[in-house]
Amino acid sequence: MLFRQVINEDLGCASYLVGDIASGQAAVVDPQWDIAPYLEAARGRGMRITHILETHTHADHVSGRGRLHEATGATMHVSPLADAQFPHEPLDDGAVIDLGTVRLEAMHLPGHRPEHTGLLLIDTSRGAEPWAVLTGDSLFVGDIGRPDLAVDAADGAREQFSSIQRLMELPDWVEVYPGHIGGSLCGSAEISAKTSSTIGYERAHSALTRSDDVRAFTAELISRLAVKPPDLDRVVGMNNGPLVTPGAPAPALDGEEFLRRAQAGGVVIDGRSSAAFAAAHVPGSLSVPSAGSGFATRAALVAGRDDPLLLVGSDEAQARDMGERLAAVGRRDIIGVLAGGFSAYLDEGL
């Protein structure tokens, strides 16, 4: 059996490559914008990605579903409750996808969104019981997924209560693999950076998983809510819509043209360190250091929703990386990167 967890540290997202080595079949669950890790892992094992599954319509990042489908021709699956406007097979509660001896069984877990669906993982060569569950945005390590991104927060929280109760009926040994880790806006400050847990551990060490009072559960979950992901409606629309593929690379601009576009309304995001920015920067630019996690979310929060973006890095490669990370949160309005990086700008004497 092949089981690979793929983490996007910038967004705190987790996705999964699951497959049967003997049959050569594999599935990707919640593919991220960068699909290279799945293709490389499958190729390294001589496997084919035959299925793509979405636990729900994501609101914080753009799915790599379209890119992965284009690269592999894999069948796409999503709940019939999603407003999916692309060819797919319905992922109903109890639906089964067999990949040789590896079985994925859908488990409807509404609350984060009405269509939200977890996946039980079963190794039929060893037994009929699940050894793990991919919980998506229902149960995280140390936290519960937020309920307010698709419906009224109280309504979503009550649905989430029922879904968590259902998950807690699973045996203690079942491993929990969530859709997010610490740093994601789909959880709260309680979400752990740990990448997995078990049903037994979460039951024993989380007040919300033990709660049998829906009103108390709802009040606590709502009290944890933080700022919503930036550009939520646009990202949801992109993920529900036709296949999203990469746009044309942003042009590299010399300093003079870069300044001209900034003066014409472009918002300049400078990804260098705070110290480097303090020493010198393009006039009017915003400092959003790209080192570490959370860059794309922070940059999208400070930039205007409809403002075109211009990117500055220590070198051009850093600016290109910033652009890729911003594309993952739906920003396809990058109109230029500073050619040669900030040192080249200084050399121009502008």
Question: Where are each of the predicted segments found?
Answer:
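Active-site environment of divalent metal-dependent phosphoester hydrolases
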Residues: 34-36, 57-62, 83-86, 114-115, ...
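Divalent-metal (often Zn2+) His-rich catalytic cores of metallo-beta-lactamase-fold enzymes
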Residues: 126-127, 132, 142, 154-247
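Divalent metal-coordination and catalytic microenvironments
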Residues: 18, 30, 56, 68, ...
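Rhodanese-like catalytic fold shared by cysteine-dependent sulfurtransferases
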Residues: 146, 200-248, 266-267, 274-350
